[in-house]
Regions:
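N-terminal Rossmann NAD(P)H-binding glycine-rich loop of SDR-like oxidoreductase domains
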Residues: 8-25
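Conserved glycine-rich Rossmann-like NAD(P)H-binding loop of the short-chain dehydrogenase/reductase
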Residues: 24-42
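A short helix-coil junction within the Rossmann-fold of NAD(P)-dependent oxidoreductases
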Residues: 26, 113-122, 168
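Rossmann-fold cofactor-recognition segment
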Residues: 43-58
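Catalytic loop of short-chain dehydrogenase/reductase
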Residues: 80, 87-101, 123-167, 180
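A short, exposed helix-loop element centered on a Lys and neighboring polar residues
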Residues: 111-112, 159
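Short, flexible catalytic-loop segment of classical short-chain dehydrogenase/reductase
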Residues: 179-189
Length: 195
């Protein structure tokens, strides 16, 4: 059985680092490529860690062009959540634009340069962490305008990836994951504010 090659973007965060640690323990995994804006605290012979600005398209292009192999799994664990609006009165255009950018552009750019790196000879997976609050049909509480809109946009990006990649890679599976609320630097400020 071939050994898996896995890429994890956002590997210094709570979920990303946990995924890195989990995958390096699996016998069927050859290498885990950990990408993050900060140093990833995962030390293991299977882990190859890189510091990467997800919004630096030139850097993403360079790194992807230097990779001469395919990935079996690509996971994106990147996002932002700051001071969600409880009412439309709380909306701030600059914060809205920042939220949309933070929760969509990294996945778009990673997809642009790394979707072609998915293994075309066997089942390969590309997943991005999203959030259930991005669901239009599941929104019964309202509020959180910027975050909800950014996650809805991310969900549409993931759906578009799935449609497009299926035309060229019949073995690929593209999907979004809803991890729920995970204790982390991302969710802690919201929990404190809502107490």
């Amino acid at each position: 059985m071939d050994q898996l090659k896995i890429a994890i973007f956002g590997s210094s965060g709570a979920i990303g680092s946990a995924l890195c640690r989990k995958y390096i323990q699996q016998e069927n995994v050859e290498k885990v490529y950990c990408f993050s804006r900060q140093i990833t605290e995962v030390k293991h012979e299977k882990a190859h860690c890189f510091i990467l600005d997800y919004l630096d398209e030139e850097n993403l292009s360079t790194i992807s062009s230097e990779i001469n192999f395919s990935f079996d799994i690509i996971l994106i664990s990147i996002g932002a959540l700051l001071n969600p609006e409880k009412s439309i009165k709380d909306l701030n255009v600059e914060k809205f634009n920042n939220m949309i950018s933070a929760n969509t552009l990294p996945t778009l750019l990673i997809g642009k340069y790394f979707l072609p790196k998915l293994n075309k000879n066997r089942i390969s997976k590309f997943a991005s962490l999203s959030a259930r609050v991005g669901s239009i049909s599941d929104n019964f509480l309202g509020g959180w305008y910027s975050y909800r809109a950014s996650k809805s946009a991310l969900n549409m990006i993931i759906k578009n990836f799935s449609i497009e990649i299926n035309r060229t890679n019949k073995y690929s599976i593209i999907f979004g994951l809803h991890p729920g609320t995970v204790p982390s630097k991302l969710s802690d400020p919201v929990k404190i504010k809502n107490k």
